[in-house]
């Protein structure tokens, strides 16, 4: 297998430098750290809203199998369905201006719309082994034979909600691996080529679905590492996480854009027909969905 030499650094771009610069580094390296993607008030509110729900989650993944446990982690708590219980997530994260300034050209270049694949809070505790290296785009095997020439169908905004260090399990990335020639071979032994994405709370590691990465081992004695993985994908793909069960009252408190992000509105690709419709028309109109409504309870 022919591989380009991995890049020796993981580049950083400040949020205020804007989407064009962030996208340029992402295109070249397959990964970029956005400094200050979430302001302090935002990530503190997220942490507060998620604390009780996260504490209820078990440490051990409910699925069996060595492959799954290697991805899920034995000392890891995972929290999904964030729009259901976090007002900050559904009102601020899903409407984050820079988030959409990045996604619109990234997916629009390939003539498609975008929405959420999944959103997960990942908390890694001391003693957790390193996650198996993988590419997120492997979720859709059709892309593997196409490799580096496949369209950008999935990206991940992995936001630090606490400090990420090499010792406490910072995500490890291989910059440049999105340009390797062969995506069908085993990458689990490429650990020596990885770089830890060390970040302060509020920073964000943005990486392509084609980029090899994996959570690092938490070698600390008492340091818990918490992050929020926000996967975004082309709307022509089935999402990993389903949000149809979220109470309608909650959904109707959201903006139309946020509703689309959780699959409660139809998607429209430039030059193509709509997706996720009812009777060939907008889903929200057919079901009488309102938006921006006051909500009586959280």
UniProtKB/Swiss-Prot annotation:
A GO molecular-function annotation: dioxygenase activity
Similarity comment: family membership: Belongs to the PhyH family.
Pathway, per record: Secondary metabolite biosynthesis
The protein's required cofactors: Fe cation
Disruption phenotype: Abolishes the production of aculenes A and C, and accumulates aculenes B and D, as well as a minor component, asperaculane B.
EC code: 1.14.11.-
Record protein name field: Dioxygenase aneA
Keyword presence, Oxidoreductase: yes
GO biological process, one term: biosynthetic process
Record keyword Iron present: yes
Keyword set, alphabetical order: Dioxygenase, Iron, Metal-binding, Oxidoreductase
Family matches, as Gene3D superfamilies: q2cbj1_9rhob like domain
């Amino acid at each position: 297998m022919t591989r380009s030499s991995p890049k020796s650094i993981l580049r950083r771009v400040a949020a205020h430098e804007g989407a064009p610069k962030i996208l340029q580094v992402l295109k070249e390296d397959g990964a970029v750290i956005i400094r200050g993607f979430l302001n302090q008030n935002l990530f503190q509110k997220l942490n507060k809203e998620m604390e009780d729900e996260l504490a209820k989650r078990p440490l051990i993944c409910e699925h069996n199998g060595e492959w799954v446990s290697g991805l899920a982690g034995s000392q890891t708590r995972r929290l999904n369905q964030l729009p259901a219980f976090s007002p900050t997530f559904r009102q601020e994260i899903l409407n984050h201006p820079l988030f959409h300034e990045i996604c619109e050209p990234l997916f629009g270049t390939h003539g498609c719309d975008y929405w959420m694949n999944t959103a997960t809070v990942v908390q890694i505790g001391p003693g957790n082994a390193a996650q198996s290296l993988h590419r997120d785009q492997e979720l859709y095997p059709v892309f593997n034979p196409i490799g580096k020439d496949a369209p950008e169908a999935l990206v991940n905004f992995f936001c630090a909600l606490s400090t990420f260090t090499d010792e406490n399990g910072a995500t490890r990335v291989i910059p440049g691996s999105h340009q390797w020639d062969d995506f069908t071979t085993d990458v689990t032994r490429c650990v020596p080529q990885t770089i830890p994405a060390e970040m302060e709370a509020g920073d964000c590691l943005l990486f392509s679905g084609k980029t090899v990465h994996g959570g690092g081992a938490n070698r600390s004695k008492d340091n818990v590492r918490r992050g929020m993985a926000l996967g975004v994908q082309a709307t022509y793909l089935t999402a990993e996480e389903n949000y149809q069960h979220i109470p309608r009252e909650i959904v109707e408190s959201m903006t139309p854009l946020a509703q689309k992000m959780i699959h409660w509105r139809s998607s429209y690709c430039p030059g193509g027909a709509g997706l996720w419709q009812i009777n060939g028309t907008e889903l929200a109109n057919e079901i009488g969905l309102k938006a921006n409504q006051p909500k009586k309870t959280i």
